[in-house]
Amino acid sequence: MALQNAWQNTKERARETWAQLTWSEVSGSLGDLGTFLPLLIGLVQKVHLDLGTTLTITGLYNIISGWQFRIPMCVQPMKTIAAVALAGGAAGLDLPQLLHAGLFVAGCVGLLGASQAIDLFNWLVPPPVIRGVQLAVGVKLAMKGVDMALRLHGGPSSGWRPWLGTEGLVVGAVALAAMIATTLPPRAARRGTLEAADEGGLGPRPTDTAFEPLLRRLPACCGGGDRAPQVEGAAVSAERAGLLAHAEGGERSGNLDDGTEAGVGAAAGGGGCGGGGGGGRIPSALIAVVVGLAMAVLHRPGLVWELRLGPTLPRLLRPSWPDFKTGALRGGLPQLPLTTLNSVIAVTQLANALFGDKPEAERRRWRPSAVALSVALLNGAGVWLGAMPCCHGAGGLAAQYKFGARTGHAPILLGCIKAALGLLFGGSLVVLLEAFPQPLLGALLTVSGIELASVVRHTRSPRGYTFALLTAVAILALDNTGTGFLVGLVGVAAVAAYEGAVAAAAARWPRVFARGGRA
């Protein structure tokens, strides 16, 4: 009876998921491929990771995550471990060491989640410091994306891409322009106003100038005419924009600052994420993936005949203390701060910011201890089968949200696609993924990075911006997420200590401070 009830509930949830699936959710489900595919392909080529097993297992990760968290919680590779493995050489990782590194991180994060120490850590860490981490990581991702879209690396030559071809500069430039244009929030101000200038448009037309007669002859859209016209369907008053931003959630309590979040409110309320120009959402990530696959097949028609039906058998991990020690020291320890911060703490705070209007019972699904246990349990099962070590991440959540995902249906759909491809074609899919145009992946990665970096706009005060920028600058300058995070914490602690000392001194010698204030 229990199994029958569980099966009925599963079927009902599946029908509900299918009924509520929209093109925005479909597009959003593909928004994180700019991060996932390059690392996956690199590991398949470098350390002979099994592609079919990884697609199947990570697809199951996606399905479980969407089912459990009910938001577009992404599944990403553990980037530091992947980077160390791809670096190669004496300091690199082979496949067993890479898998043991993932087990090490999963075990540590699992202990933090089971003991709920991660919740205490989340409470102690100031949100501006976390947003500084997100700003730095987002900038790095966006820089990598632009570089991937426009430049060549490795091979016989490096530098700008050739103009034409599926890997050409034109493809990268057009993809970048299209992605930015279709994912920008809609306008929230009348053209020809100061608010419009803040949005990248033209401000009030200058009047005391010899060019005024010429400016009057310009089309209204270029700032000409006698008065700036009202744009139908796009002009939103500052008060309404603030209300929209407030309604879309923000800090841990679910509120965004009214003054700076007009763009977020307008984007989430009017289709800005994944829908450019203030209109309905355009499934830009879906279009990019379909176009990329079509270009790959047209460029190399023989790819289709290189695919082989049938899954590949998992290669079970054999426990080895030398491999565990090497993997933990080279890849696990550098990965641990990033997983703790970005895959647990930052993703929790970002989810609260994006989905703060959901009921408390729903928000408890993605509390830090639950996310930490999810990372531990998923890897604790999948790594033994030879799947790539994975975690959740703020960048992936931001990317899927940016391209239109709003529910857990997006990762469930992506998981079904990945698992189906892994079971149908196994490792033979690598020939198709290798042929996917890199400029399109770069464009996806750029938009994902920009969305993650823009989370800093949730900061409420200039003081918070200072701490966020200090953290981000330290991470970018030192090229180390953990060290930059510590710099941000030290900055917060130093300011708190200074203000505490000043307050204590003012209480101890009130007359001295009173005279100083009058002076």
Curated annotation (Swiss-Prot):
Coiled coil: none annotated. The keyword Transport applies. It comes from the Eukaryota. It is a multi-pass membrane protein. It is found in: Membrane. Its main location: membrane. One of its GO terms (cellular component) is membrane. The chain crosses the membrane at residues 98-118, 164-184, 370-390, 412-432, 436-456, 464-484, 485-505. Induction: Up-regulated by nitrate, but not by molybdate. High affinity molybdate transporter. Acts through an energy-dependent process. Belongs to the SLC26A/SulP transporter (TC 2.A.53) family. This is Molybdate transporter 1. It comes from Chlamydomonas reinhardtii (Chlamydomonas smithii). The gene is MOT1.
